[in-house]
Amino acid sequence: MPDATDTPAPTTGQRDLTAGPIGKTLLAFALPTLGSSILQSLNGSINAVWIGQFLGERALAATTNANIIMFLLVAAVFGFGMASTILIGQNMGRRDIDAVRRVLGTSLGLFALISVLTVGVGWIVAPAILRVLATPAEVYPLALAYLRVIFVAMPAGFLSVLLTMALRGTGDSLTPLKFMALGSVVDVALNPLLIRGYGPIPALGIEGSALATLIANSVSFAALLAYIYAKDLPIRLRGAELRYVLPDRALLKTIVVKGIPMGLQMLVVSTSALAMIGLVNRHGTTTTAAYGAANQLWTYVQMPAMAVGAAVSAMAAQNIGAGRWDRVDRITRAGLRMNLALTGGLVALLTLLDRHVLWLFLGQDAGAIGIATRINLIAGWSFILFGVSMVLSATVRANGAVVGPLLILAVAMGPVRFGLAYAFEPVIGADAIWWSFPAGSLASMLLTIAYYAHGGWRRGRIAAGAADHSAGEEAKADCEPAGRSMPVG
């Protein structure tokens, strides 16, 4: 294992998460992550405004269907990224930089293969996916055109997500914010130009919006990769280290075995969202557009939970790797307090201002605005409960306990959320769908609290495969899909 002299000095934005005051360190790490979430949400929301204002309600409904599919795709690989991030964090806690780079290399090789398969298979099966979603006939052509371009945009998006998560695993949440800002600016600037056309640029309609995402993803990924090498960050690969991109069997097994349950958690959320949008689509285009607009608000409500959860996970992983179990429970408690204050404040603010904000997405359609306002009133507050589950799950996953959170989520999203919505929709109509959200969040929170207190998750060791591999080498490292955004890791 490399000694202290092999460990690069911390770069700008990189933090040692195993020392210092917990609350201050957690906040300092979480704020850039929260900034990334804000940029993602603003990016998706502003683009939804462009689409809604320039192309109308049908186009907005089309992107609502397509964006859920995009979230499903990200979910399919996100678990591997989460497993890699935890391995990187634990190895950073041990100050083993070579192990960090081995994990990153294996992950890059895996993500590159998945990216190529996604483009080819996704383009072919896009029509079938939209039919399964019961996409309204008047929306289908727009959704198909948009979705196929989004499939092409996914490889750069996948790799950007991996690098962003890896950087956070090393304790650097500032660098991802910088390049999230770059991608967001490019996407937002190109959307109106490519949708409506300008000068020699032809009007591409909804395909132009998807093309803007493709260009923004590519620019952001290329710039981030160049920056990593220019600053010689811990996750860069040079010389003989480039062979790490060829997946190592032991590391790949660890990433896949631990990553599949974590990816399945997002797939459960995504599958639930697909099922819910299928129920929503039965109520017509106006309700689908209203639901899509409410989802835009929910991206903002989720931001504190996502940011604090990512910070808690990174801090817990490094402290577990360093053997600092005395700090892990304190990190969790600090995360819960921070999350409750921030999420509760946002819920209150958006409840007061929702009608004004919804107008941006739905224009003068009073019917859709009324439906969206009711959706937000019934379901919006449930994200306070969601935040509690997010923080507790982030801590237990940091030690490799991944099956328990998966089973809890499956129960909350399946029998509870979808089951209640499906059972009561014939009785009380669309309100059954909206009430199922707080029911599912409450079930998830209660079960997660019980698991955190009594689940035995502290006995897990996600880094076992990585640690054993590293030693051998030295002998001869839960959100609702909404908007057009990538998970923040």
What are these regions (language model features)?
Residues 35, 47-51, 63, 88-93, ...:
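Hydrophobic/aromatic residues within transmembrane alpha-helices of membrane transport systems
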Residues 81, 85, 149-168, 176-184, ...:
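Short runs within selected transmembrane alpha-helices of multi-pass transporters and secretion channels
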Residues 1-30, 88-155, 201-260, 316-382, ...:
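Short alpha-helical transmembrane segments in multi-pass integral membrane proteins
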Residues 17-55, 68-83, 87, 112-119, ...:
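N-terminal transmembrane alpha-helices
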Residues 60-120, 157-176, 290-354, 386-409:
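Small-residue-rich hydrophobic transmembrane alpha-helices
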Residues 42-61, 130-137, 193-204, 263, ...:
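Helix-terminus/linker motif at the lipid-water interface of multi-pass membrane proteins
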